[in-house]
Regions:
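Bacterial N-terminal signal peptides that target proteins for export
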Residues: 2-13
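Bacterial Sec-dependent N-terminal signal peptides
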Residues: 20-44
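Catalytic-core regions of glycoside hydrolase
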Residues: 40-84, 139, 217-302
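Extracellular structured ligand-interaction cores
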Residues: 61, 98-100, 142-146, 200, ...
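Aromatic-lined substrate-binding rim segments of carbohydrate-active enzymes
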Residues: 87-177, 240-258
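Active-site groove signature of glycoside hydrolases
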Residues: 171-237
Length: 302
């Protein structure tokens, strides 16, 4: 038995030594490409790349974002806090690691009145002041912007939809968050769709710019703007496919220079809860959205 154990340890040690040698070779500081194979094949182009091994690379896969908002919970000293962020490595500047400021906000905060938007200097609402503070700070720190809009008021303490939409005759439903009654338009309502498209058109005119915007996350419908558990005017899911076609067509038409994202999950535009949804329907919608130019993302992962 002892002999078997000794042989096993000996074999393991040899494997570790071999692995160590391999790793040492792979991590060599010699940057000159060495090969005994000739790539000089007719029609090929040879490209030699010298690896950068010492400089910090920011967020290589671009999946990690710096979350922010423009609602009442946002701090006006946001940048001071994030430039002096306590971490396990000591005080760090968050923008040294991330390259995207992700701004989530209620449609009503982005668009408080018809034709009035937070990026207009004439708009002096508190959300507008927060928005401009965030945008200016992002520019100073060489960060691009990303956005999610929220049209559904459930779980909110104020209406996510601007008042002028309801005043224009859009139909919707009322829910209660704590002691506050909030109103949400039905996503299949034609007046809501007209007004939301007008907002998206104005937003795209300003932010369909790859030098400024990293991505725009669709669609803004359902809980948290993430297409969860929608309530349609019919009381069932009959409008689901038509709403999908409408919102994907609008966003793919307006955002032609920056990535548009779809929140992928089993409840996509469904009126049902998680366990009751048909995953095949959601999977088909994801494929169709991708065919229209959408990318995939999930707020659980960035």
């Amino acid at each position: 038995m002892n002999k078997i154990i000794k042989n096993s340890i000996k074999t393991l040690s040899m494997c570790l030594l071999a692995t160590t040698s391999f790793i040492g070779t792979a991590c060599s500081d010699d940057d000159a490409p060495i090969t005994d194979y000739s790539w000089n094949i007719e029609g090929n182009t040879t490209v030699n790349i010298m690896p950068e091994r010492y400089q910090l690379q920011r967020n290589l896969m671009s999946g990690w974002v710096i979350y922010a908002g423009i609602g009442s919970g946002m701090m006006m000293d946001f940048w001071d806090l994030y430039d002096n962020f306590e971490s396990s490595e000591g005080t760090v500047k968050v923008s040294d690691y991330g390259n995207t400021l992700y701004v989530r906000g209620l449609w009503s905060n982005f668009n408080p009145e018809k034709g009035k938007y937070v990026w207009d200097e004439s708009v002096q609402t508190e959300p507008a002041k927060r928005f401009r503070m965030l945008v200016e700070g992002a520019k100073e720190r060489n960060l691009k912007l990303a956005f999610t809009f929220v049209c559904d008021s459930r779980d909110k303490h104020e209406d996510a939809c601007p008042d002028y939409v309801k005043e224009a005759g859009a139909e919707g439903f009322t829910t209660t968050t704590g002691s506050v009654n909030v109103w949400t338009p039905y996503p299949d309502d034609p007046i809501f769709q007209r007004e939301y498209e007008e907002f998206l058109t104005a937003f795209a005119a300003k932010y369909n710019d790859p030098d400024v915007t990293q991505f725009v996350s669709g669609f803004g419908l359902g809980k948290w703007g993430e297409t969860h558990t929608l309530k349609y005017s019919t009381g069932d899911e009959a409008p689901r496919q038509a709403v999908f076609e409408w919102i994907t067509d609008v966003m793919s038409r307006l955002f032609t220079k920056v990535p548009i994202m779809i929140n992928y999950h089993r409840c996509l535009l469904s009126g049902k809860e998680f366990s009751d949804t048909d995953t095949d329907v959601a999977a088909d919608m994801v494929k169709r959205a991708v065919a229209k130019g959408f990318c995939l993302r999930h707020d659980a992962f960035g």
